[in-house]
Design a protein with these regions (language model features):
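Anionic-ligand binding patches
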Residues: 2-5, 12-192
Length: 192
């Protein structure tokens, strides 16, 4: 089994990565790094830079992830600024922001970047959803997860999904094509 370093301290992200990669012969090793992220509006540039900064610290091939949200009615807000907005905004703030807006579509963009110092590849998956009218579920790390439903999750908020049996989360990701599946397909065809 090949080792793959994943720069994350997020247990849920790690579980998802392992559930997709390990059946394909990739052992995912979590490394919790403090990486300063550049600011900007292009998430691909940000995740590429993040991967290179992680590689400089680890000196091994590494994967990083980043997620962004685009609220359609707000012309893509918060986009690449999602991490900061999640820190500043509560779920009630998101609901107030969307008050009176009919188009409540949101697109969650998952990004992965892999680099070995020479080759850097970025993978992206878009997941449609919507911002609901009242918070449901609980998520202390990201309260806004209580106001977002993913189209494929039968009307449940992200928080409600994560409140359920967490083992089922990894099963869902094994079945649903996402950014990790795309990465594994590429990696198997392009690594030594």
């Amino acid at each position: 089994m090949k080792d793959l370093y994943f720069a994350t301290g997020n247990k849920e992200k790690m579980q998802i990565a392992q559930s997709v990669c390990e059946p394909q012969g990739l052992k995912v090793i979590s490394i919790d790094l403090d990486i300063d992220e550049i600011q900007g509006e292009d998430p691909e540039i940000i995740v590429r830079d993040k991967a290179m900064r992680a590689f400089e610290k680890v000196k091994e091939p590494v994967v990083v992830s980043d997620d962004t949200w685009d609220i359609v009615a707000l012309k893509g807000f918060p986009g690449a600024y999602m991490k900061s907005i999640n820190y500043w905004f509560s779920s009630d703030d998101f609901l107030r922001l969307m008050h009176g807006i009919e188009d409540r579509r949101i697109i969650l963009h998952q990004y992965l970047a892999y680099t070995d110092g020479n080759v850097t590849e970025v993978f992206r998956n878009d997941i449609p959803g919507k911002i609901i009218h009242k918070a449901r579920g609980r998520n202390d790390k990201s309260p806004n997860m209580t106001v977002i439903e993913i189209d494929s999750d039968n009307g449940k908020t992200i928080a409600e999904i994560f409140e359920q049996d967490k083992d089922k989360i990894t099963e869902r990701y094994k079945k649903r094509r996402d950014v990790w599946h795309e990465f594994v397909d590429w990696y198997k065809n392009n690594s030594n």
